[in-house]
Curated annotation (Swiss-Prot):
One term under GO cellular component: extracellular region
Residues reported in the UniProt entry to bind Ca(2+): 235, 288-289, 304
Regulation: Inhibited by L-leucine, EDTA and heat.
Alphabetized InterPro entries for the sequence: Alkaline_phosphatase, Alkaline_phosphatase_AS, Alkaline_phosphatase_core_sf
Subcellular location: Cell membrane
Name of the molecule in the record: Alkaline phosphatase, germ cell type
A GO MF term: alkaline phosphatase activity
Residues lipid-modified (GPI-anchor amidated aspartate): 503
Superkingdom field: Eukaryota
Record keyword Amino-acid biosynthesis present: no
Propiece residues: 504-532
Residues annotated for Zn(2+) 1 binding in this entry: 61, 111, 376-377
Amino acid sequence: MQGPWVLLLLGLRLQLSLGIIPVEEENPDFWNRQAAEALGAAKKLQPAQTAAKNLIIFLGDGMGVSTVTAARILKGQKKDKLGPETFLAMDRFPYVALSKTYSVDKHVPDSGATATAYLCGVKGNFQTIGLSAAARFNQCNTTRGNEVISVMNRAKKAGKSVGVVTTTRVQHASPAGAYAHTVNRNWYSDADVPASARQEGCQDIATQLISNMDIDVILGGGRKYMFPMGTPDPEYPDDYSQGGTRLDGKNLVQEWLAKHQGARYVWNRTELLQASLDPSVTHLMGLFEPGDMKYEIHRDSTLDPSLMEMTEAALLLLSRNPRGFFLFVEGGRIDHGHHESRAYRALTETIMFDDAIERAGQLTSEEDTLSLVTADHSHVFSFGGYPLRGSSIFGLAPGKARDRKAYTVLLYGNGPGYVLKDGARPDVTESESGSPEYRQQSAVPLDGETHAGEDVAVFARGPQAHLVHGVQEQTFIAHVMAFAACLEPYTACDLAPRAGTTDAAHPGPSVVPALLPLLAGTLLLLGTATAP
């Protein structure tokens, strides 16, 4: 049918005639010059053969390649650009690879099995965490003896400080991969663990958070799993459903505080910023919601810190250790937006995640810090329909579908966006599709949209980043980190310390000077805002 193609060509002619597309892009010299500059930069790349003092892994939960592309366009359009020519912070990382995300038992994985792969270096089974594939989902008696050790745990044993930052609950599958061993990723609190499993000795994830290893910084959501049943939540005291859930009567926050003389617990943004500036604070736990943290578009900026602010606070504390640090940073609600088939939520979460990556890059040095950005898995999220460049990423394709109705350029293969109106697919308008609450249409009706099984990108910068190349198993990521920092099982890595130091554990440039003006200014504003 010629109709859609004719409309597309007419639209393109109109777009060019209106001057939307930069006129210089019509000249081949523009593209040749751009490519020559990129080639020149590539020729200057020199692998950093030194050891990494610090390790940061940024995990975009559910951030497949289509999500990265769409978020890049959205970030540009928010700055009044056409979109695709924009660079995300992660795009600037010089080394890129693809990661195969399958679990031992599934083509398409969950976040528990993938966390085991990229944090522990071993593939496991669907919905298990920190266990080899010899462990079976929901079978407590297969836990013991099948535990695998995370890079974060190895970093702690090597004398480094370690931290976990996430926009989900801190007991969620991705961050739990750094410290927990469980046959069921949903065992957040002891109330979620069957009595039979508790009798067999299986611990809930919240208990493991404070008992399995000494984590210096813990920031995210998940308050309700740390307190006894009936404990009112400080932010929602009248909502019983948001209060403590524990059946064992334990106050895990108090138990954690008692372990460390310099420990501090906070539950709002003001307390976080104050604690991060206090030199007496050696350990910091911040739990800012009963469950997952709010989406960025719903965040109360007076109470809830952004992912970037949590990352800054974590870096401020962790960088005090002259032996270096390991930091896990997760943009966890990208995944949740996709499961809801709400692309607006997923993409704005991706941009917030990218902002945290950019800020961390400003506060650390690639001379001594290996930074990796990746996803645990993708989603059945597509971007197509021949939209005109510069048109809204949330807009409509220029042509109609065979049912003579409009369709959006962003769609899902399955999910809750499958809706029938009078027995047919409903028409959609530009104003509807641009709403933050809009669910993109799906081909198959499901209560929740599913993960996808294609490879995901890995971006790398810093010492040993050149090892990130080609198409690799997801487990390779953990091994690159361990080798770069000379952690088990690569303690005999034979890597030289970075220039200007006598050993790889020597302190490098501190993030403290860069952070102090920002945090002090923020606290001053907060004090002014709350003054009577």
